From Swiss-Prot:
EC id: 1.1.1.-
Enzyme class: oxidoreductase
Gene designation: adrE
Organism: Penicillium rubens (strain ATCC 28089 / DSM 1075 / NRRL 1951 / Wisconsin 54-1255)
Name of the molecule in the record: Ketoreductase adrE
TM helices/strands, residue ranges: none
Keywords: Oxidoreductase
Residues holding NADP(+): Y171
Assigned protein family: Belongs to the NAD(P)-dependent epimerase/dehydratase family. Dihydroflavonol-4-reductase subfamily.
């Protein structure tokens, strides 16, 4: 680790992490606790099992939960930001039933929650950094080989849809506007804190607790039962390990060299054949693991800022580089 005295948010400070029961958020909490921070996590309903999980590993008084049931309320975060020195907003709100939503109403829902948090943070001079969990789709989901993403790249599907009458997936639209409007709000209102964002691609690795859904790792775990949904639902992407993603959030919170920056969490492209091969090595007697799709090619391109993120992981946490796919899956799948 870098010297603690250089951290923008010093160890021992309290950090707010929203959506504490989520896959990525739970790993962020673990990383922060490992670094010596106190953590307050938000959940929509009481979840004593989560408090028990972290107290068992870090002792009492290091982690606490606060219920924030509705991000849409203008005062939703007023209590949770009290006494904290940094905020990591992982749980960008999505409508509970996106099927009935228009793109406009869905993005308004997400943006409203983000802005409510930024407004609440702006009232607390103790808060030095706010980190927003965005997504690679905010920068533009590559359609094929030869793509290039950079720090100034934004997904253009919303603009194209408005001109040509095409539709945009609700999730993508919400992630794009959630991050874009956060930057616009900061530019307009000039709060005392700095904003950084983290844009992960397909995140894999260990699920910390059985009650945590596992998000994208849950799809991969389903392959062990013969569920081929990921082959159809998830286009061939790049992968990133969940702990690498969590560490990049911590870096965005504490590093004096990361200022008003977008950190891209994307390690390497892969094909489902790679995943199937690794799963069969981990569980060689599991006959339910399906065959990989016949025709696959990795999505080769250039994510320019990924090199910067990898360098930060090496400098801050002493890593050799991105965690390899095999190591990530071995950490997340039980051996037979």
């Amino acid at each position: 680790m870098t010297q603690a005295q250089n951290h923008i948010v010093p160890p021992g400070s309290k950090v707010l992490v929203t959506g504490a029961n989520g896959y990525i958020a739970s790993h962020i909490i673990k990383v922060l606790l490992d670094l010596g921070y106190l953590v307050q996590g938000t959940v929509r309903t009481p979840m004593p099992w989560l408090t028990e999980y972290f107290e068992k590993r870090y002792g009492s008084g290091r982690f606490e939960l606060i219920v924030v049931s509705d991000f849409q309320q203008s005062d939703a975060f007023d209590e949770s930001v009290k006494g904290v020195s940094g905020v990591i907003h992982v749980a960008q709100g999505l409508p509970s039933s996106t099927a009935a939503e228009t793109v406009e109403s869905a993005t308004a829902y997400t943006v409203n929650g983000v802005v409510n948090l930024l407004k609440a943070a702006s009232t607390k001079p103790t808060i030095k950094r706010v980190v927003l969990t965005s997504s690679i789709v905010a920068a533009g989901y590559p359609a094929g080989k030869g793509f290039k993403l950079d720090v100034d790249t934004w997904d253009k599907s919303l603009e194209q849809a408005s001109k040509g009458g095409t539709t945009v997936p609700i999730y993508r639209a919400c992630k794009v506007e959630g991050e874009r409007q956060a930057w616009k709000w900061v530019e307009k209102n000039q709060p005392h804190f700095e904003l950084n964002t983290v844009l992960p691609w397909l995140t894999l690795g260990k699920i910390l607790h059985p009650n945590i859904g596992g998000s994208t790792m849950g799809y991969v775990s389903g392959l062990l039962k013969g569920d081929t949904t990921p082959f159809k639902f998830l286009p061939l992407p790049w992968f990133v390990d969940v702990e690498d993603t969590a560490r990049l959030h911590a870096i965005a919170l504490i590093s004096p060299s990361v200022r008003s920056e977008r950190l891209f969490a994307a390690a390497t492209p892969f094909i489902w054949g790679d995943v199937i091969e690794i799963l069969k090595r981990i569980q060689p007697n599991n006959a339910r693991i399906p065959a990989a799709p016949v025709k696959e090619e990795p999505t080769i391109g250039d994510i320019v800022p990924a090199a910067r993120a990898e360098k930060l992981l090496r400098e801050t946490f002493g890593q050799r580089g991105w965690t390899p796919l095999e190591v990530s899956l071995e950490g997340g799948i039980a051996r037979e």
